């Protein structure tokens, strides 16, 4: 048996690769959505900078295991119940760099990898994934108050969203603008076109970055309902990843019928050399040293 290595999955194979995750639907729907996202994005840019989609030894057909690195975002998934191929793949990632393991379902495996490779954890953010079938979202009755309108976001809104996003860090504005440009979105606007509320669709097909200019006006609920219905009309089931301590968001989504389905973690490692993206400013802003 040869030495393990990470092998990029060719663009010509992405549709076949995506379809592996149709089994036991919708168990692997988020992985399906993630691959479909990059299929869609490849039509905008055939060579997206700082994006690599890896399998272990080119074995994705056998086990559905992948590690995707998109700038600082790191995604992982496997159909291998033993997790062996995912473990071996994670041990080959260059952890000298700072990554955010997005919606990680394999927290124990990742922490074991960090321990083995002497990688320090920056921070972990426990989340709960909420789910709503598209059939339920299609029933939403979206009523827009007089003087307001709903519509897609524009690239120029990225700075406003970034400035008000509590989890922003270096590179966030670019990442948010890319989502606005290439994915569906929803904004709430006043008569002058000023942005009042917003929600984005992230790479795994999860509703994210929900925000409003003013609290306690019902803007967040209106945006979520409108966006969920829009996505359902596109044939999508609805997902949201919510911090376990974010009681207002849990109440909002729960009140609309979203149900918690699994626990995940957003895990940041500490980089081990001077790099463009660093976790240290983010930790400093949180008062963590």
What residue ranges belong to the model's regions?
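Conserved acetyl-CoA-binding loop-helix of GNAT-fold acetyltransferases
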Residues: 81-89, 216-231, 250-251, 255
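Acyl-donor-binding surface of acyltransferase catalytic domains
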Residues: 36-146, 152, 265-269
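Conserved beta-strand-loop-alpha-helix junction that forms the acyl-donor binding cleft
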Residues: 101-109, 230, 240-254, 259, ...
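Short amphipathic alpha-helix that is part of the acyltransferase structural core
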Residues: 1-31, 135-171, 279-282, 286-289
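Residue-level detector of high-confidence beta-strand sites
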Residues: 198, 221, 261-266
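A conserved beta-strand-loop-helix scaffold within acyl/acetyltransferase catalytic domains
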Residues: 169-214
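Glycine-rich acetyl-CoA-binding "A-motif" of GNAT/NAT acetyltransferases
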Residues: 61-62, 194-197, 248
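Cytosolic beta-strand hydrophobic patch enriched in CBS
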Residues: 52-56, 185-190, 241
């Amino acid at each position: 048996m040869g030495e393990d290595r990470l092998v990029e999955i060719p663009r010509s194979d992405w549709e076949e690769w995506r379809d592996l995750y149709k089994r036991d639907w919708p168990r692997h729907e988020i992985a399906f959505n993630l691959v479909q996202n990059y299929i869609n994005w490849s039509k905008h840019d055939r060579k997206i900078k700082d994006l690599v989609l890896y399998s272990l030894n080119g074995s994705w057909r056998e086990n559905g295991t992948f590690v995707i690195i998109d700038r600082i975002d790191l995604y992982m998934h496997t159909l291998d119940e033993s997790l062996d191929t995912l473990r071996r793949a994670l041990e080959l990632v260059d952890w000298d760099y700072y990554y955010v393991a997005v919606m990680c379902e394999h927290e124990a495996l990742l922490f074991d990898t960090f321990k083995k490779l002497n990688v320090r954890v920056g921070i972990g953010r426990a989340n709960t994934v909420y789910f709503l079938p598209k059939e339920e979202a299609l029933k939403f009755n979206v009523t827009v108050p007089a003087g307001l309108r709903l519509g897609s976001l524009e690239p120029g809104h990225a700075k406003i969203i970034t400035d008000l996003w509590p989890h922003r860090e270096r590179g966030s504005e670019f990442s948010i603008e890319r989502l606005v440009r290439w994915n569906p979105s929803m904004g709430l606007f006043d008569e002058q076109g000023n942005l009042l509320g917003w929600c984005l669709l992230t790479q795994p097909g999860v509703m994210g970055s929900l925000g409003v200019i003013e609290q306690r006006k019902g803007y967040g609920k209106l945006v979520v309902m409108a966006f969920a219905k829009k996505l359902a009309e596109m044939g999508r089931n609805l997902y949201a990843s919510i911090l376990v301590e974010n009681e207002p968001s849990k109440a909002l989504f729960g009140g609309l019928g979203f149900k918690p389905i699994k626990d995940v973690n957003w895990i940041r490692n500490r980089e081990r050399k001077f790099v463009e993206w660093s976790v240290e400013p983010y930790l400093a802003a949180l008062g963590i040293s």
